[in-house]
Each structure stands twice: as structure tokens, then as C-alpha cells.
């Protein structure tokens, strides 16, 4: 009987600390944070990513730990932060949205400049120390050209990646094998997807599809990803891309093709509007999102106050009194 009671207590604790998606949320609180990219939560801490930084807060939003890329006056790294901080040698300069699971922080890393990403990888950090642990290598054969967000599918032991440049697909890798698993087509496309999160078999997608210049709100969408099958990479032939939306041609105007490993297939997903973010203090650039496993609150990070061109801040809206970009986490309580 004693063992049964302990087992029931453990199960109850697990259920109490598992995220569940609601259908209606109400703004409860706004917290200014030092990072502009991503937000994640476990039962003890909140985690915020900046382009070149990681921050950890307790559940009262007191900063308890941080790691920021720093250099000395000669440009030598004091703390490189990234496993490989040299873009010239295949390194990264950019964190996107993040997730935390089983004591590890999952980050999407790349070298990002004016709307294009290269040198992509999923780099995993220890949530206790904020130190690098290992990487999951990117497979460009999947078709992915940028990584804006990372989300762990806790039920299927997968990690999913979003693509800001070409948001038609989201891509999955196995946490067990560290290999490419499958991709899902987002229909209709939530363009400029900045962050994702998975709960109850549903993917939430934060899309920077508004327009800060015109005060048009960004949106959060949802998509059922249950049943996405393994497709992997297979041997095949496909056109060579010139850009994500065009193909290369030879001197005779014929499409250039390549033979080798290509994506073995995909599942079609159905994207629905989950929430229009009209209650942001100002339309800006939506970023990462997550659900607090303790409270079931929805947390969404938004940047405001600067004009955004191709995913990069181009200076403040001085005519509105802004002198810098402001990063805020919007906390929404679940109504039902």
C-alpha cells in the first residue's frame, strides 16, 4: 500500500507539471527581460534567450544566472557562448527561440544575417550550468534553410525546428538517434515563423506576420502534428535551389538537378489561427513562446520600439519616443 501511494503521488506530480493547452487566454502580466529571442519554462525556472545570451530566472522573475558572449578589447573571446563562435569556420552568431526538457536547454543556432541563415545546428546546454553539452547536426537535404525556433515533443521524443526564411515546413529530429526524422507542411503558411511549442499533440507557431511600421499585430497559430510518420532521407533526384523559392538553371535555361540524399516525404498539416496578439503594448516582432508547466500560463516574448527589416532591428521609432528596443514576456492565464 505504501508503494502504491508513492507511485500515485509521483504520477500526480507529473500530471500537475505537464503543459496543457487551453482555448482562451487572458493577459495577466508583462515582464521586461534582457533577451529578444526565446522563452522556455520548467517547474523551477524561466529561461530567456538573446541573440548571443542565455538568462535564467526564478518563478518570481529574479535573475539567477546568465551567460552572454563577451570579448576582450582585442576581440578575443572571454566567453564564446557558442560551441563554435567563428562563422568563418562553420560557427554561429545567433540563438533563436529555445525549449527546456529533462534538464537541458535546446537552442537553434546559426549564422544569421539579413534574412538568411547558414551553419545551422541544434545545440544543447545544461540547464543547471548553462554550459554546452552536445549538438544535433542539421541536414540541409531536408530542405530547411534557417532555424528560428526549437520545440521538444515530449510524447514522441522528437525535437522540431521552425524556419523563418521559408515557413512552409517544420522539421523533426529524433532525440534518440540524433538523426533527421520527418517534416510537416504548414497549410496555409504562417510566414516568418519565429517560435514554436508543442503541447497535447499540437504545435503552436508564433508568426511575425504583422507589420510594426503600421501597428498591425502578429499572430499565434496552431497545427495538429499527431501521427507525423517517419520519412527520413532517401536516395533520389531533385532540382538544385538557387533561393528557397527558385531553382538553378544552366546556360541553356534547363533546371539543374542533383542526385543524392533527399527528404523522403512529408505530412500535410492544417494551420489555424489560435490568437491575434492585439494586446501587445505595441505591435513589434513576436518571438518565442511556451506554456508554464506549473500554472499552464501561456508565455509569449515580443520586441517593440524598433523597425524590423528582414528579421533585424534597424533603429528605434524616435517619433514615438523610443530610444531602444524593449523585450517583454507577456503572461496569459488560461480562462478555459
Model-identified regions with their sequence ranges:
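Beta-strand-rich domains and repeat architectures in extracellular enzymes and scaffolds
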Residues: 26-55, 94
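Short loop/turn segments immediately following the C-termini of beta-strands
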Residues: 51, 110-112, 162-166, 208-211, ...
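Repeated scaffold domains used in trafficking and secretory/extracellular systems
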Residues: 33-40, 75-79, 89-99, 142-152, ...
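Surface-exposed loop and turn segments in beta-propeller and other repeat-based domains
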Residues: 20-28, 64-91, 132-146, 183-189, ...
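Short coil/turn segments that connect the beta-strands within blades of beta-propeller domains
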Residues: 43-44, 102-103, 155-157, 200-202, ...
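Sec-dependent N-terminal signal peptides
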Residues: 3-13
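Hydrophobic, aromatic-enriched interface-forming segments
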Residues: 144-200
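Structural motif
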Residues: 53-58, 114-123, 167-172, 212-228, ...
Amino acid at each position: 500500500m505504501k508503494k502504491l501511494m508513492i507511485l500515485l503521488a509521483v504520477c500526480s506530480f507529473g500530471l500537475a507539471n505537464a503543459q496543457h493547452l487551453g482555448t482562451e487566454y487572458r493577459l495577466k502580466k508583462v515582464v521586461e527581460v534582457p533577451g529578444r529571442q526565446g522563452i522556455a519554462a520548467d517547474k523551477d525556472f524561466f529561461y530567456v534567450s538573446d541573440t548571443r545570451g542565455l538568462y535564467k530566472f526564478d518563478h518570481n522573475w529574479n535573475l539567477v544566472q546568465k551567460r552572454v558572449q563577451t570579448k576582450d578589447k582585442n576581440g578575443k573571446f572571454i566567453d564564446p557562448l557558442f560551441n563554435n563562435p567563428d562563422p568563418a569556420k562553420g560557427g554561429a552568431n545567433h540563438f533563436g527561440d529555445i525549449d527546456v526538457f529533462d534538464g537541458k536547454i535546446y537552442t537553434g543556432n546559426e549564422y544569421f544575417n539579413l534574412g538568411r541563415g547558414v551553419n545551422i545546428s541544434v545545440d544543447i546546454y545544461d540547464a543547471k550550468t548553462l554550459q554546452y553539452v552536445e549538438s544535433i547536426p542539421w541536414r540541409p537535404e531536408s530542405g530547411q534553410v534557417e532555424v528560428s525556433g526549437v520545440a521538444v515533443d515530449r510524447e514522441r521524443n522528437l525535437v522540431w525546428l521552425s524556419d523563418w526564411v521559408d515557413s512552409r515546413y517544420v522539421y523533426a529530429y529524433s532525440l534518440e538517434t540524433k538523426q533527421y526524422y520527418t517534416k510537416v507542411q504548414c497549410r496555409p503558411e504562417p510566414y516568418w515563423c519565429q517560435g514554436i511549442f508543442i503541447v497535447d499533440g499540437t504545435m503552436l507557431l508564433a508568426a511575425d506576420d504583422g507589420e510594426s511600421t503600421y501597428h498591425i499585430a502578429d499572430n499565434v497559430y496552431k497545427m495538429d502534428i499527431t501521427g507525423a510518420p517517419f520519412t527520413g532521407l532517401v536516395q533520389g533526384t531533385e532540382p538544385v535551389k538557387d533561393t528557397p523559392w527558385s531553382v538553378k538553371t544552366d546556360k541553356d535555361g534547363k533546371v539543374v538537378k542533383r542526385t543524392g540524399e533527399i527528404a523522403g516525404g512529408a505530412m500535410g498539416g492544417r494551420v489555424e489561427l489560435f490568437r491575434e496578439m492585439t494586446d501587445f503594448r505595441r505591435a513589434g516582432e513576436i518571438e518565442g513562446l511556451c506554456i508554464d508547466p506549473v500554472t499552464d500560463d501561456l508565455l509569449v516574448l515580443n520586441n517593440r520600439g524598433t523597425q524590423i527589416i528582414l528579421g533585424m532591428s534597424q533603429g528605434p521609432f524616435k517619433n514615438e519616443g523610443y530610444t531602444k528596443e524593449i523585450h517583454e514576456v507577456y503572461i496569459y492565464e488560461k480562462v478555459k
